Each structure stands twice: as C-alpha cells, then as structure tokens.
Amino acid sequence: MDTLEEPECPPHKNRIFVSSSKDFEGYPSKAIVPVQFVALLTSIHLTETKCLLGFSNFERRGDQSQEDQYLIKLKFKDRGSERLARITISLLCQYFDIELPDLDSDSGASPTVILRDIHLERLCFSSCKALYVSKHGNYTLFLEDIKPLDLVSVISTISTKSTNSSKHSSSELISECDLNNSLVDIFNNLIEMNRDEKNRFKFVKLIHYDIELKKFVQDQQKVLSQKSKAAAINPFFVPNRLGIPYIESQNEFNSQLMTLNVDEPTTDISNMGEEMHDSADPIEDSDSSTTSSTGKYFSSKSYIQSQTPERKTSVPNNWHDDDSGSKRKRKLSFHSPNASSIRKAISYEQLSLASVGSVERLEGKIVGMNPPQFASINEFKYCTLKLYFTQLLPNVPDKVLVPGVNCIEIVIPTRERICELFGVLNCQSDKISDILLLEKPDRISVEVERILWDNDKTASPGMAVWSLKNISTDTQAQAQVQVPAQSSASIDPSRTRMSKMARKDPTIEFCQLGLDTFETKYITMFGMLVSCSFDKPAFISFVFSDFTKNDIVQNYLYDRYLIDYENKLELNEGFKAIMYKNQFETFDSKLRKIFNNGLRDLQNGRDENLSQYGIVCKMNIKVKMYNGKLNAIVRECEPVPHSQISSIASPSQCEHLRLFYQRAFKRIGESAISRYFEEYRRFFPIHRNGSHLAKLRFDEVKHEPKKSPTTPALAEHIPDLNADVSSFDVKFTDISSLLDSSARLPRPQQTHKSNTLYSCEGRIIAIEYHASDLCFHITNELPLLQTRGLAPERVLQLHIITSKNFAYFFNRSSAYLQRQPLEEKYTQLAQFLGHSFKFNITSSLTLFPDTTVALQIWCPIECTFRELQQQLAHPKVAAAPDSGSLDCAINATVNPLRLLAAQNGVTVKKEEDNDDDAGAVPTS
C-alpha cells in the first residue's frame, strides 16, 4: 500500500462492503471507490506529520495472520485537519478506555502517540467508512467515518442475528448480513489465535474478560467444533464407532495439546501416565458427552491433568475417559423436567467417598472463601483458593461450617485455573466475591470434579479434592434473556460492567502505589482536589493529594499550593491524573448539587488552584507507567461530603478516610482551614472551638455496620500460639478421632472458644503458605497404603493465622516477615514435609468477612519453627510407635510437666526463655 493524496471531490458512488483486504486485489489499478468494513482496532500511529489507524480481522494468509490489514490515513494537511484528527483519536480512545498519556505534554510540540497490539488488552470493534484510492497498483485508504461498536452490543448482534433478519427489508439485509458475517469471522479467527500456544492473544488477558464473554466464546467454539468434525471425519473410518476418542493425528504427540484444540473430546489418558504435562487453555469447551447437561454453565471443560511450575493435578492411570458412557459421573441434568431432583439434600458423607474423576452438579450457595482477602493472583503461588459450598434448604443454614459435615470444600488448585475461571483482572477477593454472589442470597449452580491435588510441598500421590469445574448463576441467565435484539448501531455503549468492577478495586493510599514497567492496575483512592486545568480539549487535568508521599516518576504538579501560596505540596506528595469529558460531566454535576456551581465557576479567573474548597473525592483510577512516567486516568470520581460518607464509603474505606482527615488537617494547617471553615465543613468532620479555630471531630465519621436483629453474632476466636497450656483441658488422642464426622458436628450454641487441647501425632503431607495463613495438612495414615490419594476427610488442616502468631512461629518481627520474600519462607518449611510431629491443637472459629457464618478450623498451640526443627532432629521422640500411650503422645516441644499438671488441674508457671537467639530461623 502506497501513500496517495485524497481527492478533493470524491465521486458519488455506492459504497461497497469489503470483508477482507484481499477484495482490493480485484479493483482497477486506478480507481476511487467508497468502501466499508468491520474490524478490530490494533494500532494508532500519531505524529507531527501523519495519523494512521490500523485495523485487522486476523484472517490467516498462509501460516501467519495478517495484522493491520486495513491501514487508514486521516487528513493531516493543515492545522485544522490535524486538530480534527487528534480529536477523532481522542474520542475513539475515550470510548474504548484507551489512555493517551502524551497528549498532556508540557512542551509546545505536538505529542507523538504510538500504540501497538491494542487487541491484546481489549477488543475494539469498529465500523469504518473509507475512500479507496489507487494508482499504478498502489492504494491508500482515507478515513471518512468511524463508528466504535460496544462489545456487549456486538455479542448481542451475533447471538440474535437470526431474529433480526426477519425484521429488515432486502436492502437492509445485505448490510446486516455483511456485518454479522464479519463479526462472526473475527471472533472465529480470535478463537483460533487463542488456541495457538505461540500466539500472544489470550481471552483471559483481556481487560473486559468476564463470564458473559466466556460463555459466548464457548458457544462459538461449539459451532466451530461441529463444523470441523463434520469436515474432518472420513465416513469410511470413524474412530468414535470403535469407542476411541477422536483427535487429529498431528496433535497426538503434542505436549501442549490442551492449548491447541479445546473442542475435541478428551483424549484417552490411560497410556499417557505421568509424561503428559499440559497447561490449561484459557477458554475451553464443555465435555462433548455432557453438552446437554452443561450447556448452561459458563466455564471451561475440566482439565483432566495439568501441571504448572507450582502445582499439578492428575488422575490415576486406571481411570479411563472415553465417549462410551463409562465415565464415573453422576449426572443431574439442568434441563430435566424434574427440577426438584437437583435440590435434594446433599449427602456430604457420600461426596467424601467419591472416586477420582467423579463429577457432581449441585445447587446451593458459596458462603465463603479462604484466604478471605487477597489483592493479586500472585498470592496463590504457594497456596490454593478454597470455596465453601452449602446447599440452600428451607431451614436456616448452619452458622458454623465444617467441611465434609455440612459443607463442601471446593479447591481451585492453580493460579492459571483461577484466571481461567474469573479472568486475569478479576483475581482480587472483592471481585471474585462479587462474581460468586457471596454478599447476595442468590443461589448458584456448580459443577465440581474429584481430582488429585499436589504441589512441590505435597507428599505423593497427593490428596483427592473437589475442584471447581463450572459455575452458573440464575441472575446471569436472566440478564442474557433480557438482552434486546437490536443491532450494534442502535445500542449505546454499556458502562455498567466498568462501574461494577470499579467498585471492587482495592483501596490504597498514594504511598502504597507501586508499578512495574508494563503493569496496569485499577485502584481506588481518596484524596483532596488541589488544582484543575481545562487547557486540553479532549480531557481535564487534575492534581490530587492524600498527603502521603511516593517517589514514583510523574509529570510536574502545577498550582500545587494549599490555600496559602507559601504552603506548597512537595513534588512527591500528590499525583497528576486526567479525566475524560463524559466522566467529568458526571463528576461536575455532583459538585453543582453541593456548591450550586461547576468547577469552572469555582476557579478564580485563571487561577487553577481549588484547595480553598477542600473537595474530598473518591476516585477509581487506572494507573500505568508510560514512557517512564506515571499515567493515571480517572475512570470514576465522586465527591465525598462528610454527611454522605456512610453511603459512599465502606467500613474499611471509612478507616482510610479517618487517617486521611488527620493527615490533611495537619498538613494544611488549622489556621488556614479556619479561614475557609464553611467550605471545609462540607467535606471534613470539623467544628469550631472556643478560639473560633477549626478542630477535627471524629465522632461524626463513624460508619454504622449492618446488624441482624434476629441472629446472634458468632464470636471469632483465633488462639495465640503461645497460649498457656494450663488454661486448657488436655486430652490425648489421635487424628482419626478428631476427624470422625459425628465428633465434628457443630454444636447448636457453638459461639465461644474451645477449652479443650488435643495432643496428637501427625505426618505433614502438604504445606500451603499465604501471607495471612500458614496451613499444615497432617494425617496419621501410612504413606504405603495410600495409592489413590488421601481424601480431605482423612486429613487435618492446622492453620496459623494473624501476624502475631506468624511472628511467634518464625521468631521474627512482623516487619521482618513482611520484608522477607515468600519463596524464602516457603523453602524453609519444605524440610518438614513427609515427617511426623507431635501437635497440640484446639478447635477454633474464623468468621467470613461481612457475614454471620463461621468456619471451624484447627489451630496449633505452642508450635514454632524451632520446635518443629527440634522434633525433626530427634525422630525417636517425635515419632513414637504407640501414639496412644501417654508418654509418646506428649509433644516434645512442650514442657511435659506443664501438660501433666494441666491434666491434673494444676497451674504451672511458664518459664521465660533467656536465649534470645534460640528461636532464630536459619536461612537454609
């Protein structure tokens, strides 16, 4: 394609719809043709001399897909056309939420913006009208009109194309048909790219990846799969007739099979053994043999065997998977007319006896997860995500959950699997909680599969656990039914998903912000508006401060003084952010309700500083490093009047505000605030004292938590690791007795701590480590007898929770443990794997956040890293042959006199350890 000049007066011709740039090959060598196409925006090239937009439908040509098949030029002849081009680019990026950081350049020269591979982050569908100009075999496309297409409306258009076809005239059908076919082709090409392990495009890495998009892609996969099977199978030799799973021959020895073709039935794994190491595909289809019963689900086909550097799951070789119906599954079809069959009471004991490979479909409620709070997918490098599922019955559910007794513990074993189920950018506790409807009474449907779980810190062959395979919610199904059958051109862009996700962004202070070179984060911050600039036509620039400091590199802070010109923010004490016009209009309208004026009216002439108003804002911000500097885009901004705090901020965010008020009051100064008392009292909890000076009054900042008047609150009790043993009733027992289901049944009034201490012996078979929870999986069953993996019901989980207990266990300060890399601590714990130890444990309750439901857990007492090392060094003491005898049951790490005295009801004074370095954790 060559660069030609656009004709001044293009001819009036009928516009031709093109589905590929290959259509241009049949055009005359010298021609001017109006054309139209639909494609994905892939690149933006904006310099001082030209403006180019790249589009592609990713049609394959040979072995590679041709990117930027349509390279469109915008007019750039003079200042007027240049300004129009920049406004067009700005509006287009604003629609698709693409940041343009350099448009706010401080220099006088026109900024340069070069963005590539936009489709790797977001799908920007666009309908373009262009002028095709060719000469001597070369051609150029000149943009005449561009219409961005919202992804929600694109999916709706494809899904309802058959319905719409009957409502249009024949002339309209041509355009609608071309539009639908192009959109379908693009999605099909993206699916092929997603399957290709070498291609960087993956659906789960998209910013707007969610359950709706996932289900739509799966539906498209099924259509592609049916077409490919119909074309590929030889009618004279059909492998499936012989009971053999069909799979293309070129994939038989492909170690990355599951990333290439997820639509084919699962291959026979009986001959693969331990040699096949797969990585789960981000978008997978449901198993072909259960399509009728799992079509309602929104997640992927279960991976039978997957391995990652951190963790792997597997199935025994004697378990055969084929299409002959011999799978060990108990199917409960959602399409069965007898809907009550799925709501029958769950037998948790029967579920605990299920064999590996079994699949169950259940309806009920996920009431909690562990860890309950996390901010990043990287926190699961050394632990799993556990969900606690219970059935919804007419009676009031139990307040105390005991896995295997009145609930099911569902494990998501790997980081990759978490991303696959919820999306890369949804891997935060608040967002996953929202997806799972933890805070709502709605029921959900889950499909779980029995798998073997093990990792680097798990004794072979691992544990048989229930893993989440599919999930469905009624609210999502209703939302899909209610989507109107309209064309993409008539549907306004949906911002509902963005606002919903923004409410779940983690709340941090400016000093806590850290970014890697290519990292993008979505955060919530509270801050005071310091200054505002309307210099740029495409967006508004702001300076905010929460009065914490961060040395991250950013653009210069303008007009940064705080009421008095002499009192200026330091350059690392605030941050510069931009807001596009549609977000600003919403923000400005809220300010008008408070001040009866907009921001422009509040400014004093050309003075851009607004610190005299004390405007406190809650901001949902997208942050990223661009050209080595902080690029912050405010996606949603809301003023926070002090009288409305309880409706705007959550209880945890109120604590952020409380600290913010203290910093702001100290930094701005009591005298300065007093001069603008009437303005500041709108946003700050202040009152006048006897000297007519402003004072903070925190009693007005309290956030009233929601209380249930009919439900007595459970008391969470996490015992201290260094608790006095003499305060417990000591019982010597074994793990089997503690795991007995009747013994673990929650008591009706179990709302207080346990006073019983159990002394028992167990072998550590797995270790999970999270920043908030250290978990030892222990059992007393012999390893030689376990050839199919231990069931969780035969394993006791010991949890060490709270920073105080962490510090006591490692004999280090909390500050030191926060600085110490997770890998280092995890490696130190590995030496205990597979060995038997004596433990003193007690039953405890941990509450799920914002609920009245508690989880029963086991916590050790008098257990430290050093004490476990001592037991490891003296195996005869730690692993006695008769675990039932009194002498052998006493933990070698606890003073035996104290235990015996406690058993006889005698209190023994705890002796202090004078060896300061005795408990130091070795580095190796």
UniProtKB/Swiss-Prot annotation:
Give the GO terms filed under biological process for this record: cell division; regulation of telomere maintenance via telomerase; ribonucleoprotein complex localization; telomere capping; telomere maintenance; telomere maintenance via telomerase
Where is this protein localized, as stated in its record? Chromosome, Telomere
Basic and acidic residues composition-biased segments: 309-326
Ranges for region Disordered:
265-336
Q: Give the consequence of mutating residue 50 to Q.
A: Increase in length of X' and Y' telomeres. Disrupts interaction with POL1 but not FUN12
Q: Which Pfam families match?
A: CDC13_N (PF16853), Cdc13_OB2 (PF18691), Cdc13_OB4_dimer (PF18233), POT1 (PF02765)
**Can the keyword Ligase be found in this entry's annotation?**
no
**Phosphothreonine modifications at:** 308
Q: Which molecular function terms from Gene Ontology are attached?
A: G-rich strand telomeric DNA binding; identical protein binding; single-stranded telomeric DNA binding; telomerase inhibitor activity; translation elongation factor binding
- What does the record give as the DNA-binding region? 500-686
**Assembly information from the UniProt record:** Interacts with POL1, EST1, FUN12, STM1, STN1 and TEN1.
Q: Any extra remark in the record? A: Present with 319 molecules/cell in log phase SD medium.
Give the protein's recorded name: Cell division control protein 13
Q: Gene of origin? A: CDC13
